[in-house]
């Protein structure tokens, strides 16, 4: 038996075994409790990265652990395989998106299998396949029938050269991210999902998601953005209509001194028509449209504005309020108009300072008087109303309702609720997405594709020039069709669906991936597996993907296809993987393999070690998982990803840490190999007979470790502390003098410890442990199906305990006592302790406070 651990000799062997034996293939079993573990599936970009490895390792450990606990575990994997990168590859390299995608899937599947992940590959789905998106198209038709899918004109970012709509994140400094052309705003007919039909249910559901990080729930609540307030009408000074504003701060209305309107708001064009300012206003609006919408609302972004040469009236004070177009108000939030109260809103304050506008204090702090002329920032705390007419002296929060009632009585306002969330625009002028199953007929209008004609499949022979709009819009065989209603000539919808649609229900399809009957989901199978018990993925998906998935599940529920409201019971958002950067003065950033002994391999210059940042290709601070597996094995990569940091924290990459994990695995291998001959024919110690000394301590340590690991891994996902406890146990075993072969009791205790180590490590380093388990004589059994060890509380209990002795709360001594020592005896020992006695001299003992199994505090005075 090779005493040296060589992962290459065992890892592929066990991967073949699991595949040949269908070890991780599962079916519904009503007699067993189910556990559905899911990591967010990847886009098939070509190669997995260390972020994938960490994410999937976390999930795999939980899946294997739950399996060993006796659960019927569903742990599937698939591919979020529609998307722009495949289409860009077709444009840039002349390779069809389907071929590019499937080649990438083949390679990445091989990489994932090489990591030893316990996926049920029989349930693999790829969202770009018609067998998947045909059901998505069916759901679309049902949504259209129920009014949940609809088409309307909408303002979009448009690239004139690419002839396509761009998402906000695809606009960089007003330019198309791909071709660099100037992006313009365009009004187009777009398809939408009516997510707002479920808006209150989605918001209320956040309160029941107790297994989700509060940070994610806060982000979802804020994105939904439910606000209670008033819609206030500000009459135009010239008598021509009103400007309507939604505000949650009607308590500050007496301090509203000017009006702000989003520069791109249609109202701006109405207000400036025929005025000298018209040309400047149009130019300003075009400039603002090019600015990033998220940046525009940032506190730190430059606040720009243009006076529109018109005024409205404050409905409570009658003041004339100058009206400005600005960049820090968005047209699609609220009414797109904001009443500015510069003394009580910091952005308004900065704007007023910049343009020399009037400031009036209407909320005063209780301890001082504010002078608007000397204020250096807005006062945004609570206080008492001043300069507010009949409401002077009221607490501002109590004045909210009173002023709302006053506005209603004047006919100038009404109570209302506003939401930030808008309906989900799903139209994409792209080829590589699921076709929208609708037909446009000049006689009948918009007509659904008959269900019997689904799926509407993407044609293969398309033009991927990247110019002239969607390839589908230029494909006559696809575009031209017959109207299902009148039989006349018609055209297909050439837009495809947003790829977030595919990822909004893939977890339900995993429950029945081969179900080929309408409606594509087998209710019995879905009801057995759903909801997902543990979902794992990055915080970057906290809003859109998770919100869309929650909406889509409710929609499928209302169609009778699923029986749950929420798709994911528990959510873990793992941290990023970070690594220090290295840079050469001449060659810029370097990959790790381009650095040898601190020097650039290209020019031998000494490299500059930079700060630790998230791994990225641009910084070249990435680690190739394939290299890691070749060099150290998959088990080492898995262990390091789990040991280096708790799963929710960022992981700082350390080559020394990887080496350390490899060494520990090697130590574990060697100690088992070294004991193999001695343990032949020896059963694990069963508790018969009394143990003493080191054997008793070893067995106690073993059961304490089992208890800690099961607590850390099963309840809290504290894999790093669980691994640390196992390492301590291995070290304890190494420190034990080797017993003679005839000491069968000692060997039985050692075998119990070794088997516990192997079983506890099994979810973490499955290849190593399967091999060691077999070497110990468990041929014909698979460790993945072996129950976890159970600790005996009496064995794990300490014989002795250390009690801290305090005098007036300060530690003065410690005493070791029997674990079952009586309280009065412990107090007596504390009073008689030599180190304590000098702190008691000349003082009166008031009382003794005993904290069981921890400390005695002697309270004295004098």
UniProtKB/Swiss-Prot annotation:
Signal peptide: none annotated. Its EC number is 6.1.1.4. One of its GO terms (molecular function) is aminoacyl-tRNA deacylase activity. One of its GO terms (cellular component) is cytosol. ATP binds at residue 617. A motif ('KMSKS' region) lies at residues 614-618. A motif ('HIGH' region) lies at residues 42-52. Pfam families: Anticodon_1, tRNA-synt_1, tRNA-synt_1_2, tRNA-synt_1g. Belongs to the class-I aminoacyl-tRNA synthetase family. This is Leucine--tRNA ligase. It comes from Syntrophus aciditrophicus (strain SB).
